[in-house]
Each structure stands twice: as structure tokens, then as C-alpha cells.
Amino acid sequence: MQSVKKAVCLPQFRDEEVTVKCSNYIGDTIDDAKLLGMKGILFIGHIGKFVKLAAGVMNTHSRQADCRMEVLAVHAALEGADSHTVRSVMDCVNTSEALRVLKECGLLEKVMESVMERIEFYLTNRAGEALDIAAVVFSNEEGVLGKTSKADSLFEQTSRFVRQKKGR
């Protein structure tokens, strides 16, 4: 959790009333949040787990699905990567290595924009209209890699809640 706070500068969110660790169970967390009547969720996760959301995989445990390189390679191809780059991404062992390949060929930002659009699509589809939902994806090496469209708004709402709660 410390790397998350460092990567996205969230030391104010140490309050357990506003943070919940959901492990690999993104889909179940969304379903439970709707049942509990929550208004919104801002997920913050490492690229190694959250890239799977761009394929609609809502349980990110490696036993359920490991499509990390496939997702990054497809989005690289969609953003104009040549076959050598796509193969290089597919041959990577971990997302840190894949991000390095994408950064070296100048595609990291475009690929992450494309990935974030798909993450938003699947999160919104799972949440329905009952829940505002957003995600921030980071890596330990690169920091924040991408955000969905409602991430800043949900971040601000949560920050306001924490400040009001603390009487500031």
C-alpha cells in the first residue's frame, strides 16, 4: 500500500473510512458497493493487476487470467506499433518490462490512453448507473500511467469528505 500512496500522492487517504483493500476482487467489490448503496468508487491499482480490467477480467488473480502482455500488445498494435514491437511486448515477463519497451518506442502514453478507455468501459458496464466509478493505474517505476475520466472528480470528492471529517 505504501507504493500506491507514494506513486499517486495519497497520504491523506490513510483513513479506513475512505479506503478499502479489495485484493484481486474488482468485480465483487463493485457488486458489493452497489448492494451497500455506495455512491462511488475510485480504484487505484498497479498496472500488473489493473491492465487485466481492459480485457474485462474482474478477478485479477493470475490463476483466473493472465492477459497482461496480450492486452498491452493489442493496444500497442492499435496505436501503430510494428510487428517487432508487438512481439517484444508479448515476450516480456512482467509489465515493468513491457512498459519499458513501449516507452522506448514512444508509444507508452498512447497505449495507456487506449488501455484506460477500455478499463473505463468495463468498470462502467459492471457498475451500471448506480455507482460513479473510476480508476488510476500506476507502476512503481513510472508513477501514474493513466486515469479514467471520472478519476479526478472522485478524488476531489473523497478529499473533500476527508477534510470535512477532520474539521478542516
Region roles according to the model:
Residues 1-39, 49-50, 54-168:
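N-terminal loops that bind phosphate or other acidic moieties
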Residues 46:
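Glycine- and acidic-rich phosphate- and metal-coordinating loops
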